[in-house]
Amino acid sequence: KTFLLSSDLVSVREQVKKCDQFPIVLKRIQGYMGKFVDKADDADGVVEVVKKFWERGDDRFPIIAQEFVLSDSYRVLTIGGEVVQTALKKNKDWKATGTTSKTFEKFALDVDLKKIIKKVNKAIDIDICGIDFAKREDGSWILIEVNSGPAYDFFDDEFKMLIEKALRHLKKKAIRQKISKLVKLF
């Protein structure tokens, strides 16, 4: 349950009055490290958060509203569609970003999450991305967001390896594109 909010406050209030579930999470489509992410408990709270975002930022980037699920944060890093790292971010607060979580651990992908990751990678066509998930109490997964500029530093001992994988992937892609252009010339 994710939807794009209108760019005027009267319409925002009308949109969220139709919500059947609060609290909801609000976030700008552009942000980093949990900035421009907040939670609202009712329609008035949503309007206040939107105003706050608009006052804090130079631009009025679109804002999305998302179902709130109390969950740890599950990050999956993919390079070229391949899962190269998982990081479970635990936090006592409702917001479990890489900057607020102090400990990370790996987690195993279940069959359902593997299917979702495959669909997400196919749909977004981003070579290197971090995909964030939450988990409902019933065990079902919720896609929170896809980051096109993901962090590589959840585990210090993997940082160098991940950078090398990313560079190898990008180099191979650049070579394939160059060859493809050459083939078209002939």
Cite the ranges covered by each PLM segment.
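Short beta->alpha connector loops
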Residues: S6-V10, F68-S71, D127
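Short strand-connecting beta-turns/loops that link adjacent beta-strands
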Residues: G31, L70, G81, R136-G139
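C-terminal active-site "lid" helix and adjoining low-complexity regulatory extension at the edge
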Residues: A108, K122, I126, K135-F186
